[in-house]
Amino acid sequence: MITDTIVELEGVNGERFNLTTGDQGVFLATDVEGCFYDPPVKVVYEEPGNYPGARYLGHRVLKRDIVFGVQILNDAKQGPRSWLSRDSVWRKAWAFNRVCKLYVTTPDSGTRYLYLALFESPKVEMKTDPRGNTINLTVMSCISYDPFWYEDDRVFSVKTKTDTRFDPNFWTPPWPWEELPKETLRIKVGREQGGLNPTDQYIAPKWTVPGSTEKIPDFPWPFPPGVEIPWETAPFTQFVIPDYSFEDEEFANRRLKTPGLIYGENCIIDTDRREEQISSESGSPVWARMNGVRFRNMIPPYTEEREFVIDASGCAPGQVVTLRLPRPWSRCWGLE
């Protein structure tokens, strides 16, 4: 049987192995377990006393326990083509506390990758000295804490064209959003860009928004520790970021306003509720200034398109807002 599937491994040290062609004398063996198809899932249910059968409550995707072997060639007694050298190079690519990336490339689905680490030490049969064999099987017991296969994130960006900077001293805090100069930005993602979410999993968009390009007048940078920032005179940017619901019509156009972002507060907004909501380049706790308001909507599987509308204020021309869309899959191929 001829296959055009390419399997590669990128080690923790950056070493790359093509396990299909065996470019380093290491080939993927047969009988791979727990790797290429759907991850294990545990269903939670209840069995009420007055209800026939059971009722579904939820389910949880579990880690992957992966076992596979590699055949390592022994083409020389010594040197880089020997089994000992190749086995050493292979082992140095692995760690228990750092992850490798296993890549699978197919003509239909492109390239997807899985993060995995050692779960047990590699095993080699020692009935005889493996240095005397022409080929040796090494069994790898691995764990994938994140069970999904990923494509590279899709990134979309838009630049500000209008100068919406203003003098914060013109108003008395809090600054009235309705009166601030603003620019409306739009990012449209559709079929031409590969779809908004073509995967079989829910995804949480990530945004990057820039802080002000202007430093605080008569105030040192970096900010001295223990000295209160004069917020009333600090130039800032502010944004209204989409948090659209695709499953609840009431919140189909929901958007959230960010806090004012001063110089050094270029921010990443992660709408995944399991992660820190807003992280700042300067390390300042911008998330604490959200007053408990959170992003809460994810993009469902197989969502084709949507236009995202962003309002920006306090920006110089040329500042960039980006939208990053993850691409998680249950399998290394198919499901499109």
Curated annotation (Swiss-Prot):
It comes from the Viruses. This is Minor tail protein Gp27. The gene is 27.
